[in-house]
């Protein structure tokens, strides 16, 4: 039976429209922390906050997260098809990394397509004194293993995003046609044990208009 992707969008969209269109980093992180959400300590909080918000607000219409895994790879939700939720700051360029390549291919084979909900917007960044990073580190209470490893390598600390103003939310139908036309392979390097990580799918947001079935425009 063919999937009516627009019908699924019509179920999800009224809920997504209730989401705040401006995210203050401190408020979002504290909200996740107070509600014992996982990954509130992560520096790339915009992605984790969107996943957290969807988990809390879409759970009545979706299975959250999707219980089936492809190998070890999960999808964020399930409503007739697997779904993933992604956040993207326009300052990061036009390309976005999505899920594991083989997991996406297998899910498309099982269901015909995978749904992506992509939040796109402009981020504001921490100042040179890194006050936001300092505040976030204080919330964590102790230095994370990631931070210890960074210092050991002598690597500079990346500037944190302090807020995000959402300009649009796109509902993308990722099927074989879209994957073949617009998907490329993103190699992630190696795991801590030296083994190569599985490649992911990289999409150019400027090219996927004909795969985008629905857009919430906040510009």
Provide a role label for each language-model segment:
Residues 1-73, 78, 87-219:
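Nucleic-acid endonuclease domains
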């Amino acid at each position: 039976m063919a999937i009516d992707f627009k019908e699924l969008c019509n179920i999800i969209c009224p809920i997504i429209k209730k989401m705040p269109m401006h995210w203050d980093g401190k408020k979002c992180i504290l909200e996740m922390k107070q509600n014992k959400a996982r990954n509130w300590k992560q520096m790339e909080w915009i992605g984790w906050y969107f996943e957290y918000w969807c988990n809390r607000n879409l759970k009545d219409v979706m299975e959250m997260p999707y219980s089936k895994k492809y190998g070890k790879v999960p999808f964020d939700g399930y409503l007739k098809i697997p779904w993933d939720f992604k956040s993207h700051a326009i300052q990061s360029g036009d390309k976005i990394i999505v899920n594991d390549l083989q997991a996406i291919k297998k899910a498309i084979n099982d269901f015909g397509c995978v749904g992506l909900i992509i939040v796109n917007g402009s981020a504001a960044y921490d100042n040179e004194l890194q006050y936001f990073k300092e505040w976030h580190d204080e919330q964590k209470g102790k230095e994370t293993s990631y931070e210890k490893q960074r210092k050991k390598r002598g690597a500079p600390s990346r500037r944190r995003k302090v807020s995000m103003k959402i300009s649009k939310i796109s509902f993308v139908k990722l099927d074989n046609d879209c994957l073949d036309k617009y998907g490329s392979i993103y190699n992630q390097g190696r795991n801590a044990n030296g083994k190569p990580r599985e490649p992911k799918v990289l999409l150019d947001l400027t090219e996927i208009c004909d795969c985008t079935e629905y857009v919430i425009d906040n510009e």
